[in-house]
């Protein structure tokens, strides 16, 4: 039996630019946030998760990742304690952070170091398994790598290329290039506002697809988001916080025109706007969260709370998944 335990943490994410348009080949930009998921493995006589038996239907990400190590039978039994600061089903990547943290904990436990590409592939496949075969690598890549991550359908030559990802689906093979961006915005924070309204990503993606099918001219909105994302990337590279904020607000206007905002999101966005450089929904929309770029995070957080949301303050440049030994 392993004499020591392992604790690993991994960050959630919020999307600054490109949601929905990324489905159609445009780039998208995500930021690793301060709020994290924590996984602690402690030697036990059987596999449990927070004291209850490990089960594939209840813990699909964990079971999928264990399969890459040969399954439960190939590993010493552990109690898996899962905790975190990321609300589930909110668009902040809680399941991806769980996958990234559990992967790093198994890597440390078994002393089997993985390459960056291997870690990205295994975490992405766990997300895809849990989502019945389709998942973007954005969430898992941001959780693993930390910082600012750019996902595109091509190699963005002026960014740091990390790895390629592909996934076979019923609609064909999907492919992505994963990059990191060194972004330094001084004196600003992100404030995330959670509406508390759950809106499944697949439903929102389907809603946009149906809108585009009914009115092909709406494709101009996708092209507009792609152009805004590229302007936002340029502003991030140059450290121009005002331009980043402006691009965020522009992005939201287009997303709203696609019908993926909601009354709850608009209420929080309106409340946060006076103290922010830019505001937008983050993620698939319909509910979930919004994000504000601000020089006065406390004031913005208070405004969000006063409007009925739950606020979380985060800085840029948060580290990716990491693990360490603990006393069992």
Language model features: what each stretch is:
Residues 71-90, 114, 118-125:
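Glycine- and acidic-rich phosphate- and metal-coordinating loops
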Residues 33-35, 92-112, 116, 147:
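DPxDG-like acidic metal-binding loop motif
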Residues 26, 92-97, 117, 135, ...:
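Short, conserved micro-motifs enriched in small and acidic residues
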Residues 18-19, 82, 94:
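A secondary-structure boundary/capping signal
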Residues 287-289:
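Glycine-rich active-site/cofactor-binding loop and its immediate structural neighborhood
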Residues 2-11, 15-17, 22-23, 30, ...:
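C-terminal nucleotide
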Residues 90-93, 280:
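Short helix-coil transition sites and intra-membrane helix breaks within transmembrane domains
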């Amino acid at each position: 039996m392993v004499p020591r335990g392992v604790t690993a943490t991994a960050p959630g994410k919020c999307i600054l630019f490109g949601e929905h348009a990324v489905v159609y080949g445009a780039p998208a930009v995500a930021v690793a946030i301060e709020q994290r998921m924590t996984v602690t493995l402690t030697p036990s006589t059987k596999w449990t998760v927070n004291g209850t038996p490990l089960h594939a239907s209840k813990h699909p990400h964990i079971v999928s990742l264990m399969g890459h190590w040969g399954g439960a039978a190939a590993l010493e039994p552990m109690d898996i304690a899962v905790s975190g600061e990321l609300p589930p089903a909110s668009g902040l990547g809680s399941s991806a952070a769980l996958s990234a943290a559990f992967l790093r904990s198994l890597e440390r436990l078994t002393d089997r170091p993985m390459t960056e590409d291997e870690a990205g592939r295994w975490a992405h496949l766990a997300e895809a398994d849990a989502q019945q075969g389709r998942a973007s690598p954005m969430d898992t890549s941001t959780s693993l790598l930390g910082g600012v991550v750019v996902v595109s359908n091509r190699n963005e030559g002026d960014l740091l290329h990390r790895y390629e990802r592909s996934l076979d689906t019923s609609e064909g093979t999907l492919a992505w290039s994963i990059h990191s961006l060194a972004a330094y915005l001084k004196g600003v924070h992100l404030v995330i506002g959670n509406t508390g309204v759950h809106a499944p990503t697949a439903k929102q993606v389907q809603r946009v697809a149906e809108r585009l099918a009914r009115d092909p001219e709406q494709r101009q909105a996708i092209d507009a988001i792609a152009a805004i994302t590229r302007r936002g990337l340029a502003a991030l590279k140059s450290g121009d916080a005002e331009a980043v904020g402006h691009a965020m607000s522009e992005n939201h206007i287009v997303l709203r025109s696609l019908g993926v905002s909601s009354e709850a999101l608009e209420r929080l966005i309106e409340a946060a706007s006076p103290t922010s450089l830019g505001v937008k929904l983050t993620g698939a929309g319909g509910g979930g969260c919004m994000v504000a770029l601000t020089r006065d995070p406390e004031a913005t957080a208070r405004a969000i709370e006063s409007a009925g949301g739950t606020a979380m303050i985060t800085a840029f440049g948060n580290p990716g998944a990491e693990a360490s030994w603990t006393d069992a």
